[in-house]
From Swiss-Prot:
UniProt miscellaneous comment: PIN1 harbors a single amino acid variation in a strain resistant to buparvaquone (AC P0DMT5).
Entry keyword Transcription: no
Its biological purpose: Peptidyl-prolyl cis/trans isomerase (PPIase) that acts as a key virulence factor by promoting host leukocyte transformation. Binds to and isomerizes specific phosphorylated Ser/Thr-Pro (pSer/Thr-Pro) motifs in a subset of proteins, resulting in conformational changes in the proteins. Promotes host leukocyte transformation by binding to phosphorylated host FBXW7, disrupting dimerization and promoting FBXW7 autoubiquitination and subsequent degradation. Degradation of host FBXW7, leads to stabilization of JUN, which promotes cell transformation.
Regulation of protein activity: Directly inhibited by buparvaquone and juglone anti-parasite drugs. Inhibited at lesser degree by the non-quinone inhibitor dipentamethylene thiuram monosulphide (DTM).
Molecular-function GO terms, alphabetical: peptidyl-prolyl cis-trans isomerase activity
Protein's name in the database: Peptidyl-prolyl cis-trans isomerase NIMA-interacting 1
GO biological process entries: symbiont-mediated perturbation of host process
EC number: 5.2.1.8
Listed GO CC annotations: cytosol; extracellular region; host cell cytoplasm; host cell nucleus; nucleus
Broadest EC class assigned to this enzyme: isomerase
Subunit annotation: Interacts with host FBXW7; leading to FBXW7 autoubiquitination and subsequent degradation.
Annotated signal sequence range: 1-32
Length: 142
């Protein structure tokens, strides 16, 4: 009976296309949230949420982010705490969505961000990741 059902699915061209694309989509994309702190050396040192120029140094951004990372690693509810912190502190427009960037593939983000994101397991947080945009903490959602 299961074999007949699987044969039906495979022999139906539309369903086969849907199944294959679903598998490819799931394998080649991740969904992450992030917390971004910019610094004076960032590509665009302006807080996307306030419109204010960022005045912190890279060293200050790293130090501040290390504090957030330590706090998150001690959290009993990483998902909730990460989203709360990203909403309050991130300097990316994604802060309005708890830092959620949605699904993205290997060609969407800057290379260090992509590499860190695809190495993470679901519900895992990265170490500090530096890109031209600033210093990030990345949380893999899916």
């Amino acid at each position: 009976m299961i074999r007949n059902f699987l044969n039906f699915l495979w022999n139906n061209t539309s369903l086969r296309f849907l199944i294959i694309n679903t598998i490819i989509f799931a394998m080649d994309k991740v969904r992450c949230a992030h917390l971004l702190l910019k610094h004076t050396g960032s590509r665009n040192p302006v807080n996307r949420n306030t419109g204010m120029a960022v005045t912190r140094t890279k060293e200050e951004a790293v130090s501040e982010m290390k504090g957030y990372l330590e706090m998150l690693r001690k959290s009993d509810n990483l998902d909730q705490e990460f989203r709360r912190l990203a909403t309050a502190k991130s300097e990316c427009s994604s802060a309005r969505k708890g830092g959620d960037l949605g699904f993205f593939d290997r060609n969407t983000m800057q290379k260090p961000f992509t590499e860190a994101s695809f190495k993470l397991e679901v519900n895992e947080i990265s170490d500090l990741v530096e890109t031209d945009s600033g210093v990030h903490l990345i949380y893999r959602i899916a």
